[in-house]
């Protein structure tokens, strides 16, 4: 007997902004979404700040968005959790940080601090780095090296020079620390097994290979002169004495796991085979749990479990569910949606479609959306699933390139695919919900006319197809309770989100 599916389509990076010359969403030709808005109940949801467990005014992101959607509650995020620990002093008592620094004192080895040098708040914040430098100074460490990964996606594409200059000033002010390498996140924070990129980052940090420039600020300036912005800056070695070596300690101060896993595994996992490298022991601290299977690491801030999220709860009821996305967002519909745990629940199937191997997604704004759509439609029509969770990555990943024309094409691609998925769900007598995890593509241009590559704090859409009803405004945490509501199921007590349906 075929199941009646409830399908949730997450249009990653599709926000609701003011129409205008820099809004790829309003510029795009979207006949499907236009029709769905006109014919179905719809509302908007908050996807940023306090409503998703972030500091007030902080833009949302994919990790946070999917965690809140899957959790059915506001999930307090790592950024404010760690920042509050700095304010309370708990940060400086952290056992993992202390172990890393004490090992340096005992062995006479170096401490390496690396991560995204940015205040974007998505993967990291510089305030946490400053606190680590202060802690190292207070403990009497002298050999402290910073490997600075430039952002250019969650902040302005040319803000890196100022962050590097600020870092140099902070090191002088605190009295410890020196930038050893500087490079774009494109190399150090890959998440799609593009080993040739990651090896360039590794070789710079471990072997001191790459462009040499003792002045990190000048190195960034020269990159700009060559037309290369922060994200794509090739690794530069600023201090040949600051390479990572045997028995050194490393603290990776990024708190978001997905782009921290590959470079971490290259350092700590003796079984890593992405590229040739020497394995040696280190005291390695992951700021949060990047991967439960990661060997030879300490975790500074273990994840707080999200009990009875949507996936776990559906499984406990004996229901079936499908998670489907392409590589760039696969972790989001699985790991993050399940509250940051690797568990694949009984009855939960997963489909991974490979993202295209292109340098940047403006070169192929369609990404793998059509293949994701094909596979999703096939699974929906199979009648095998009670719930389907689907992510289209285009609006976010292409939005991050800052190329408006490509972002318009990305929106149009998603529009066509959404129509096919919704049709399949309704043909099966099911329900379809369309939403987003945060904004991005609706604001592609800065007020000064330069490209905008970061997320936004704009609200996101929520459309309910196949159930004539009235909806209220809400937040991402309200989606799971709404799914359960249309399925005629009670919410578990751990969910504090509320159904969006007005009774």
Residue ranges and their predicted role:
Residues 1-503:
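Feature captures the catalytic ectodomains and active-site-proximal regions of enzymes
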């Amino acid at each position: 007997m075929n199941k009646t599916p409830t399908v949730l389509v997450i249009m990653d990076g599709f926000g609701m902004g003011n129409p205008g010359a820099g809004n790829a969403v309003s510029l795009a030709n979207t006949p499907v979404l236009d029709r769905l808005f006109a014919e179905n109940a719809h509302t908007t949801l908050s996807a940023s700040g306090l409503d998703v467990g972030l500091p007030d005014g902080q833009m949302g992101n994919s990790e946070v968005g999917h965690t809140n959607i899957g959790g059915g509650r506001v999930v307090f995020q790592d950024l404010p959790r760690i920042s509050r620990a700095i304010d309370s002093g708990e940060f400086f008592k952290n056992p993992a940080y202390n172990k890393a620094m004490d090992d340096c004192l005992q062995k006479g080895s170096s401490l390496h601090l690396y991560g995204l040098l940015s205040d974007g708040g998505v993967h990291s914040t510089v305030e946490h780095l400053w606190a680590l430098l202060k802690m190292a100074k207070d403990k009497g460490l002298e050999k402290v090296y910073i490997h600075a990964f430039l952002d250019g996606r969650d902040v302005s594409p040319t803000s890196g020079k100022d962050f590097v200059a600020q870092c140099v000033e902070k090191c002088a002010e605190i009295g410890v620390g020196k930038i050893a390498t500087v490079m774009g996140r494109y190399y150090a924070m890959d998440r799609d097994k593009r080993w040739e990129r990651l090896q360039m980052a590794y070789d710079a940090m471990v072997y001191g290979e790459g462009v040499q420039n003792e002045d990190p600020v000048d190195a960034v300036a020269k990159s700009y002169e060559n037309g290369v912005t922060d994200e794509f800056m090739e690794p530069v070695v600023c201090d040949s004495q600051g390479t990572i070596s045997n028995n050194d300690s490393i603290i990776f101060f990024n708190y978001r796991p997905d782009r921290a896993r590959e470079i971490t595994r290259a350092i700590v996992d003796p079984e890593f085979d992405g590229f040739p490298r020497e394995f040696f022991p280190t005291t390695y601290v992951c700021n949060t749990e990047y991967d439960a299977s990661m060997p030879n690491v300490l975790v500074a801030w273990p994840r707080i479990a999200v009990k009875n999220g949507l996936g776990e709860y559906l499984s406990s009821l004996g229901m079936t569910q499908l998670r489907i996305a392409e590589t760039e967002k696969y972790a989001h519909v699985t790991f993050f949606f399940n509250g940051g745990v690797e568990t694949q629940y009984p009855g939960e199937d997963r489909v991974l479609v490979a993202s295209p191997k292109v340098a940047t997604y403006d070169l192929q704004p369609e990404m793998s959306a059509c293949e994701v759509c094909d596979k999703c439609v096939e699974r929906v029509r199979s009648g095998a699933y009670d719930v389907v969770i689907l992510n289209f990555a285009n609006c976010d990943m292409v939005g991050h390139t800052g190329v408006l024309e490509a972002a318009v094409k990305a929106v149009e691609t998603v529009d066509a695919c959404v129509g096919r998925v919704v049709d399949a769900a309704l043909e099966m007598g099911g329900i379809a919900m369309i939403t987003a995890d945060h904004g991005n593509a609706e604001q592609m241009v800065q007020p000064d006319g330069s490209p905008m590559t970061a997320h936004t704090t704009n609200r996101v859409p929520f459309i309910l197809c196949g159930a004539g009803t009235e909806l209220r405004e809400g937040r991402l945490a309200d989606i799971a309770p709404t799914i359960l509501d249309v399925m005629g199921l009670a919410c578990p007590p751990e969910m504090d989100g509320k159904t969006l349906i007005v009774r």
